[in-house]
């Protein structure tokens, strides 16, 4: 087991062979698999089949809740999460660019990267930023725990669903550990039913995944210039 502190560090560890199996977000998984030929997505959480990002806004903005992104946010300040985050950057950047016809750095007065979803929430809640992009699961968890001042910050828009986290394995593991090793790892992941283990991932179970599930993520990343 090799702990890492960021998506970028996880991708580097996978590329350099420090780890053969890793738990990635959708974007970091695409990035990592592209560095090692024949690498495969093996499994995803049941909850990862459909993930969402929320755009949240401080009350002072007067931005409206709607089915489309409120164009009145032009000229405001915006914070994403980690630069390599699927839910905290890639997906919201894609839809903001689609809505405004230009990249966020041209839409907003200032664009920041908080580093994580909890920090994004606090920055918008405090008014340090007008608007933020946050993983829906983090918002819902904090809301249920009573940790959000809903008089200060609210959800104004929800993205369409997209696939997110997954287990990915290097393409050279069968050569390194023996024929069929990758399949055995996949079977073990899908059979995981220990409540404590699943709770550590905030997942109810793992189900099969494959690279093609993340083709839309790859295309989106290419369109916004995050990968070649």
Annotate each PLM feature.
Residues 45-101:
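A conserved helix-loop-strand patch within extracytoplasmic ligand-binding domains
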Residues 1-66, 136:
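Short, glycine-/small- and polar/acidic-enriched structural segments
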Residues 72, 87-113, 141-148, 219, ...:
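Ligand-binding cleft/hinge of the Venus flytrap
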Residues 77-98, 183-228:
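Ligand-binding clefts/hinges and TM-proximal coupling segments of bilobed small-molecule sensing domains
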Residues 1-12, 27, 103-122, 163:
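Short helix-initiation/N-cap motifs at beta->coil->alpha
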Residues 14-15, 73, 124-125:
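Hydrophobic residues within well-ordered alpha-helices
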Residues 45-54, 147-189, 199-216:
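Periplasmic-binding protein-like
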Residues 23-36, 97-98, 123-126, 130-150:
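A ligand-binding cleft/hinge motif common to bilobed small-molecule-binding domains
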